[in-house]
Amino acid sequence: MNNSEIININGPFKGEIEVPGDKSMTHRAIMLASLAKGISTIYEPLMGEDCRRTMDIFKLLGVTIEEQDNSIIINSPGYQNFITPHQVLYTGNSGTTTRLLAGLLSGLGIESVLSGDVSIGKRPMDRVMKPLLKMNANISGIDNNYTPLIIKPSTIKGINYQMEVASAQVKSAILLASLFSKEATTLTEFDVSRNHTETLFAHFNIPISIQGKTIQTIPYAIEHIQPRDFHVPGDISSAAFFIVAALITPGSDITIHNVGINPTRSGIIDIVKQMGGNIELSNVSKGAEPTASIHVKYTPNLNAVTIKGDLVPRAIDELPVIALLCTQASNSCIIKNAEELKVKETNRIDTTADMLNLLGFNLQPTHDGLIIHPSEFRSNATVDSQTDHRIGMMLAVASLLSSEPLKIEQFDAVNVSFPGFLPKLKLLENEGK
């Protein structure tokens, strides 16, 4: 990732769009469909770089994956017939691929090595390794904490585990490993995190029990898995950039269709409403993974908010662009209890503050979040995504508050989750002219 992009978009934005399929759900659907013997079709998947790394790894395990225009067809021999890979399993920039497959491959007992790019090599893996070791996984890393992760065969045991942080990746690694245990596993969450692993377990016929913050799997749950087709909703994390772009750009009026609004992911909608933003939902579907059309209009004079507690995991990936939105509030805003931001593609507390402060905004990082003061775009300094796709897109949205072009280094990082981001933003601008 090394190309720069000069952003020269001003709005207003008008029209109707859809955003790419949800990244979290695409990863998990690929994994579960690959475990199930037979054919599964995943419709409207995200075909960004992260999800391609997950696909590539299952191909190395013996799964046939065929890409079509708006779907992927997965023809699996079943987990019982996976082959041992004879090369390093490269996860690229994908923390989801790395952490979830650490659990899944430990459960499968397949000798393997997981390794990613330079960014992944800096991200700690101890939080996922700790519970897996309690489950008798044979897994080790560099300094017991970093990739590459070396996995060797072992017999996975069920555990009772109290989560120490609200992390869907850690939770999912435990649940995926537990599928292969002869004992039940009981997991209690710290705060409820995104539940796509649980909803997709049920979709692929894997028994799972959920009572409040407590989740339980049954012994050898993997034996129940069946191939299934799955339609991936639009990613609310991708929609977030258009939501904020419309809210801060005078004259904007947009609708984003078929966006996933799973309650464990829809924190940004609640935050925008608390700020007095003009946002409405329509065409709301029901089910484990509900969707809606999101209608957003420009809103001046936004209210100040404090974002904390269980609202944080429900908006964790959107917090950088929410921080940008908070610079346009009438008074100072606070984000707290967001330590999880430190172990994303970058330390997003520091990166968000550093990059926005370079542009003249006023953000103060804290040990667990940010204090964001009302402030304006004052400098067209060159900024850098730091190879973080969400930082890159957040900075592109920040440029809307300037009348001058903005140069963003390493902007190709956005291809991790949204390869067509800029063309879609320009499309809405063209409709607004």
Curated annotation (Swiss-Prot):
GO cellular component assignments: cytoplasm
Broad class of enzyme this protein falls into: transferase
Residues at which phosphoenolpyruvate binds: 23, 95, 123, 169, 348, 390
Signal peptide region: none
A biological process term (GO) from this entry: chorismate biosynthetic process
Catalytic activity: 3-phosphoshikimate + phosphoenolpyruvate = 5-O-(1-carboxyvinyl)-3-phosphoshikimate + phosphate
Transmembrane segments: none
Assembly description: Monomer.
Function: Catalyzes the transfer of the enolpyruvyl moiety of phosphoenolpyruvate (PEP) to the 5-hydroxyl of shikimate-3-phosphate (S3P) to produce enolpyruvyl shikimate-3-phosphate and inorganic phosphate.
Name of the protein described by the UniProt record: 3-phosphoshikimate 1-carboxyvinyltransferase
Organism per entry: Staphylococcus epidermidis (strain ATCC 35984 / DSM 28319 / BCRC 17069 / CCUG 31568 / BM 3577 / RP62A)
